[in-house]
């Protein structure tokens, strides 16, 4: 097993354990009080509880990650949860490519939680450990299949140049349906928002787990 495979395997094991106390870890590690102390189900009020119950049915992180700040605005949180649900479990984009798009956004934002949560999911969906490792190193991954290269170019162009070139769009039309192109665009935009939410709230990785990206890493 190569080093990339070992790294992905360790992430998968860590993700399976979840991290309900992630925000508490942030306070201990930095000496700062968390911006949003971690909520538990018994702390939720009548407006928050329905959302919390839905989150707990599907979330590998409990009420942590983006859900912790989202619960502070439960009406918005419910609408975001419904969007997340579609973009994770009902999207027309194949799971491997969907998770690849999420990782591209996670790497651009150096989003510790986003990468920590989704790298194992991408690997489980069949994305090569080498592709994941090269993306993490901020390289254009080598050895990508045509559809993977298209997702990389489409998402990267859209988020860094604020447009999709005619050439890349023509490639997309050969590989994806109109619905898939729209869904791919939506998942990229959604996970920019998730990265923003995580950054604003200073949500972090699980207790005792090294963040994927070092401080100051570009």
Predicted segments, located by residue:
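Bacterial N-terminal signal peptides that target proteins for export
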Residues: 1-15
């Amino acid at each position: 097993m190569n080093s990339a495979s070992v790294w992905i395997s360790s992430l998968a094991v860590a993700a399976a354990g979840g991290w309900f106390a992630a925000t508490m870890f942030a306070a201990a590690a930095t000496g700062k009080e968390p911006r949003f102390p971690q909520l538990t189900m018994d702390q939720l009020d009548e407006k928050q509880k329905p959302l919390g119950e839905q989150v707990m049915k599907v979330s590998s992180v409990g009420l942590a990650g983006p859900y912790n700040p989202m619960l502070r605005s439960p009406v918005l949180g419910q609408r975001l949860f419904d969007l997340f649900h579609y973009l994770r479990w009902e999207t027309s984009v194949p799971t491997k490519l969907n998770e690849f798009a999420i990782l591209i956004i996670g790497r651009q934002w150096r989003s510790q939680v986003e990468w920590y949560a989704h790298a194992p999911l991408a690997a489980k969906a069949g994305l090569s450990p080498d592709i994941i490792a090269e993306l993490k190193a901020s390289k254009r991954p080598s050895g990508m299949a045509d559809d993977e290269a298209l997702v990389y170019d489409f998402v990267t162009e859209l988020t860094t140049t604020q447009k999709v070139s005619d050439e890349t769009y023509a490639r997309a039309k050969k590989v994806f349906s109109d619905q898939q192109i729209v869904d791919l665009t939506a998942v990229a935009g959604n996970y920019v928002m998730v990265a923003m939410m995580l950054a604003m709230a200073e949500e972090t990785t699980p207790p005792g787990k090294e963040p994927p990206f070092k401080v100051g890493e570009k």
